[in-house]
Swiss-Prot record:
Co-factor: note: Magnesium is required for nucleotidyltransferase activity.
Protein name: Multifunctional CCA protein
Binding-site positions, ATP: 8, 11, 91, 137, 140
Keyword terms of this UniProt record: ATP-binding, Hydrolase, Magnesium, Metal-binding, Multifunctional enzyme, Nickel, Nucleotide-binding, Nucleotidyltransferase, RNA repair, RNA-binding, Transferase, tRNA processing
Tagged with keyword Lipid metabolism: no
Additional free-text comment from the UniProt record: A single active site specifically recognizes both ATP and CTP and is responsible for their addition.
Organism: Photobacterium profundum (strain SS9)
Gene it is expressed from: cca
Length: 411
């Protein structure tokens, strides 16, 4: 019975990155032997055990054979005669197929270290095509390691394209698609996840609402990049630079879905995209079972972002109306979410990446002033019911006017 550290822990250590989780592989053991040593079995599909003290995962070496469509159609074989090399062969990428012995010696039968040195994401074997989830995983790894200069091997991209054409991705469940997308939102370059999916044709399958933006023109006067899809990728990049918050990053990626629905006769204008975008956002979130906080923030940004772009000339009462609409009094975090997404939107344009965005400062100043208005004096003055709400709006509008006037004069 031999134990090896495998997968991401070995890879990240070799890259000089922080190792978060450690996964172990056990060769030459049976489930009975593991249980006898105090390990707790947790895997139902294949033998995985938790260490009695560290609670880290220990999996018995196994092989996998395709038995059906999708990512669940596998027959797993786990026995003491399965070798280390056989287990590593079933893994997706060479950089994830390196094992380490307790003394630190590396076992690297598929040249993962060489690919790490050359910054290449390359599949281990032709069996890569048997699991459609790997298309999304490679896209996510590409997003995670893009800042280090990693690229995908041409032959791996070719396999991913073949899998898309073969219809393999249609077997993916909504939960698995969302899980990979959500993980990509935590990477250094979330826009690369979408770029890779677009490159291999998968974006049209798993996120057709985003894919539909590519090729749709915008006015060159405001959008030198012209293409709505390119703009979306640029906004996604800007949002990632502005905030680590996954909800904000998601909202930025889907805020312009309505532009794909603009009438062709109106192009390159998109006058109704803020309203038109609500339906595809709802459809996308329902299909992929996106959590409600992601969905609601995305809908808010979609509905309001064009208004905020005109904050320089917006009337105080309009600010108060918007703050009411987004439920900012109960959910103050929405104001900063909206401000950051709008800043990302404004900067997600060719040549405007470093523009100042005073509109965000005006919005935040308006909210800060309105929030400080106390309702108690209004109630004490004898107002009741709807009259309280009306008076509160009047007082908030007056406070907002004082707060934003100096900022608007700078615009």
């Amino acid at each position: 019975m031999q134990t090896y550290l495998v997968g991401g822990a070995v890879r990240d250590a070799l890259l000089g990155l922080k190792v978060v989780d450690k996964d172990w592989m056990v060769v030459g053991a049976t489930p009975e032997q593991m249980l006898a040593q105090g390990y707790e079995q947790v895997g139902s599909d294949f033998p995985v055990f938790l260490h009695p003290k560290t609670k880290q995962e220990y999996a018995l070496a196994r092989t996998e054979r395709k038995s059906g469509k999708g990512y669940t159609g596998f027959i797993c074989y786990s026995a003491p005669d399965v070798t280390l090399e056989q287990d590593l062969m079933r893994r997706d990428l060479t950089i994830n197929a390196i094992a380490q012995e307790k003394d630190g010696r590396l076992i690297d039968p598929y040249n993962g270290q060489q690919d790490l040195d050359n910054k290449i994401l390359r599949h281990v074997s032709p069996a890569f095509v048997e699991d459609p989830l790997r298309v999304l995983r490679v896209a996510r790894f590409s997003a995670r390691f893009a800042h280090l200069g990693f690229t995908i091997a041409p032959e791996t991209i070719a396999l991913m394209q073949e899998m898309v054409v073969a219809g393999e991705l249609e077997a993916l469940t909504p939960e698995r698609v969302w899980k990979e997308w959500e993980k990509s939102l935590s990477t250094e370059n979330p826009e690369v996840f979408l770029t890779v999916l677009r490159q291999c044709g998968a974006l049209k399958v798993v996120m057709p609402e985003i894919d539909a933006l590519f090729g749709v023109p915008q006015p060159a006067q405001w959008h030198p990049e012209i293409d709505c899809g390119i703009h979306t990728l640029m906004v996604a990049k800007q949002a990632a630079e502005l905030s680590p918050n996954k909800v904000i990053r998601f909202a930025a990626q889907v805020h312009d879905l309505g532009k794909a629905l603009s009438p062709k006769d109106d192009l390159p204008s998109h006058k109704m995209h803020c309203k038109d975008g609500l339906k595809p956002i709802k459809a996308l979130c329902q299909r992929l079972r996106v959590p409600n906080d992601y969905r609601d923030t995305a809908l808010m940004v979609c509905a309001q972002h064009t208004k905020i772009h005109h904050a320089n000339e917006m009337r105080p009462a309009t600010f108060v109306n918007i703050l009411d609409q987004i439920d900012s009094w109960r959910k103050p975090e929405r104001v900063i979410q909206l401000a950051l997404c709008c800043r990302a939107d404004a900067r997600g344009r060719t040549g405007h990446e470093n523009d100042a965005y005073l509109q965000a400062d005006i919005l935040l100043a308006a909210f800060d002033a309105a929030q400080q208005v106390d309702v108690k004096p209004i109630v004490a003055a004898g107002f009741k019911g709807k009259d309280i709400k009306e008076q509160l709006a009047i007082h908030r509008t007056a406070a907002v006017e004082l707060a934003i006037k100096p900022l608007q004069s700078k615009a």
